[in-house]
């Protein structure tokens, strides 16, 4: 998911997306441990998506306090 797409979402939508991605990450890690995952790169991609969302939320928080 691109950062430009994420920036269009509201804070509430981003927080919901984080919860969704964290659940997905949990399931991917579980599948990886039992050996049933076919694309292990999806784990790293999900972690990066979570980081992107957290970065956008932090930027908005800083802009709100400074601006």
Swiss-Prot record:
| Record SUPFAM superfamilies | Ribosomal protein L29 (L29p) (SSF46561)
Q: GO BP, one example?
A: translation
InterPro entries the record matches:
Ribosomal_protein_uL29, Ribosomal_uL29, Ribosomal_uL29_CS, Ribosomal_uL29_sf
**Sorted alphabetically, which Pfam families does this protein's record hold?**
Ribosomal_L29 (PF00831)
Which keywords appear in this protein's UniProt record, sorted alphabetically? Ribonucleoprotein, Ribosomal protein
Q: Which residues form the signal peptide?
A: none
Gene3D superfamilies for the chain: 1.10.287.310
Q: Which family does it belong to?
A: Belongs to the universal ribosomal protein uL29 family.
* Stated name of the protein: Large ribosomal subunit protein uL29
